[in-house]
Amino acid sequence: IQAKAIPAMISGIDLIGQAQTGTGKTAAFGIPILEKVDPKLKKLQAIVLCPTRELAIQVADEIRNLSRYMHGIKVLPIYGGQDIVKQIRSLKSGTQIVIGTPGRVMDHMRRKTMKLDFVHTVVLDEADEMLNMGFREDIEFVLSGVPEERQTVLFSATMPKPIMEITKKFQNNAKVIKVTKKELTVPNIEQYYYDVKPKKKEEVLSRLLDIYSPRLSVVFCNTKKQVDLLVNALLGRGYFAAGLHGDMKQEQRDRVMQGFRTGKTEILVATDVAARGIDVDEVEAVFNYDLPQDDEYYVH
């Protein structure tokens, strides 16, 4: 996706990138954004919309990393559940690139705490996921509020009708780039499945954890309730487990992720949506406690 998207984005045209998670698309839009941003201009110049807080934080970290030898570039992740006054202060202090969830970006636009006059690039990352989560109106509000003379770039794993409607309304002759599923990046992963009665799942998971002793593992569940139930069950069995889902406050989520990254928590139990964008190197095992409702979730 990078080889195809970077030249197209740098040329300034509107773009639709159909690519799954794990294809390196953050750099595909991050590098062109950094090429186009003027470090001397201490005004907002690019906005990236992401479906979740975790993904916004991760994308911001990656773009910061890409810009570490460029002086004067400020990247700010903004999302709900975080102190808005701090965000306003950071926006006033010359942030050029905002990575945010649609709701919070819209909130700043309504409060007039985000000045959009110099915005030349808007990226929708995981656009289908944002629509699934009910962000369509927020996205349309944001796109309607930025200058018309801009580049609009959209990345999505799937292309349902609502995405095509947004494309038609807000993009001009967008170039379509596809990275097909055959090229999906999951090398060197061994997969196994066990046919287990629901009430035996907890016992089987515990046995597998004992046999293989993965350093860090992620367990995916389909519901928040199941996450809470399983975390309590694992803690009761003496495992170092913690849960992650959308009902948790941002501080709690940050604390859980910090514990997992440092290895204090060995088992992260999460819903698919909350876990989107999690990037931890040392994960040795992934358990799909429930079968994901979407094959894209299964791969990511």
Task: For each feature predicted by the language model, list its residue ranges.
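Conserved helicase RecA-like core
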Residues: 1-300
